[in-house]
């Protein structure tokens, strides 16, 4: 990790020097972060995760090599789950304060992240959502346990689902079974922006057999699945993984925000700045150079304090 960080910093400095040598000191260096994964877990305060004996992978493996935020919150009074997933995608909740399906909470707005990415200059930025326990044969607009549609923000937007069409080709192409992620990593065919939703057993939401401990179940899932990302070519060559929680179990947090990247400060760095989900959204927008900053992302700071090189 230390070697990768030194190489990233050297590359950043080289780009800056080359720009000056070319007679254009104001030209920004090329963005170093190329691929983003966002993993959203469920309903835990950071105080329940950090130091927990039920989360040995997070505490003993991830945190020592990662950066993390100590003051990351869900937006004020933004509960239950769905409003927070929508916020990560659009910087606001559109007045939604329930977990209703897209049948009752469909949005016609095109002002959300993946549409900005699709329409980005230069041919767009590719995106894909990996949802655990969907079939991949249709647009997953309804709950099919252990898949919870409220944890899949994209299907709430008409321009993703062709206005709630279960046979939407665009939706089916972009919202895929999590089980396909391993193949895509091996083939180096992951999208530039990837959103990962474990099922409601593995995201620390439900008590499920055989473990019957929410935190331990989620930690076990991360230990099993995260290494395939961290060992991938896409991660090593300019990747970042953001692991966060949708909302706190008590009040608004703090909740977890863990950043893993060759460009993160890492080494257990604990940032003290205050953020909410708008900061994550702004950070992703800055990485891919898309505007306008959506909703409260326009007022939030980005997460660059957690990086040694950004973006």
Q: What are the language-model segments listed below?
A:
Residues 22-311:
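Flexible, surface-exposed loop/gating regions in the mature catalytic domains
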Residues 1-20:
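Fungal secretory targeting signals
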């Amino acid at each position: 990790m230390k070697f990768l960080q030194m190489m990233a910093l050297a590359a950043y400095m080289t780009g800056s020097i080359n720009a000056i040598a070319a007679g254009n000191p104001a030209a920004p260096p090329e963005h170093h972060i190329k691929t983003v994964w966002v993993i959203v877990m469920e309903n835990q305060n950071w105080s329940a995760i950090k130091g927990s004996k039920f989360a040995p992978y997070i505490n003993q493996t991830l945190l020592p090599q990662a950066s993390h935020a100590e003051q990351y919150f869900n937006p004020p009074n933004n509960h239950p789950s769905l409003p927070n997933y929508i916020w990560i995608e659009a910087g606001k909740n559109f007045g939604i304060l329930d977990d209703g399906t897209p049948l009752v909470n469909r949005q016609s707005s095109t002002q959300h992240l993946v549409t900005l990415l699709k329409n980005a200059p230069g041919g767009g930025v590719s995106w894909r959502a990996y949802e655990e326990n969907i079939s991949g044969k249709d647009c997953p607009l309804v709950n099919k346990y252990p898949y919870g549609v409220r944890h899949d923000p994209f299907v709430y937007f008409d321009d993703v689902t062709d206005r709630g069409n279960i046979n939407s080709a665009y939706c089916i192409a972009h919202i895929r079974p999590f089980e396909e992620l391993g193949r895509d990593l091996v083939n180096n065919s992951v999208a530039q922006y990837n959103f990962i939703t474990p099922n409601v057993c593995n995201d620390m939401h439900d008590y499920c057999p055989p473990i019957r401990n929410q935190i331990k179940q989620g930690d076990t899932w991360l230990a099993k699945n995260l290494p395939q990302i961290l060992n991938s070519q896409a991660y090593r060559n300019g990747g970042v993984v953001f692991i966060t929680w949708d909302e706190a179990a008590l009040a608004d947090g703090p909740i977890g925000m863990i950043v893993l990247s060759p460009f993160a400060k890492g080494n257990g760095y604990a940032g003290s700045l205050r953020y909410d989900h708008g900061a994550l959204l702004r950070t992703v927008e800055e990485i891919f150079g898309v505007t306008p900053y959506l909703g409260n992302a326009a007022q939030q700071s980005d997460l660059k304090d957690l990086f040694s090189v950004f973006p």
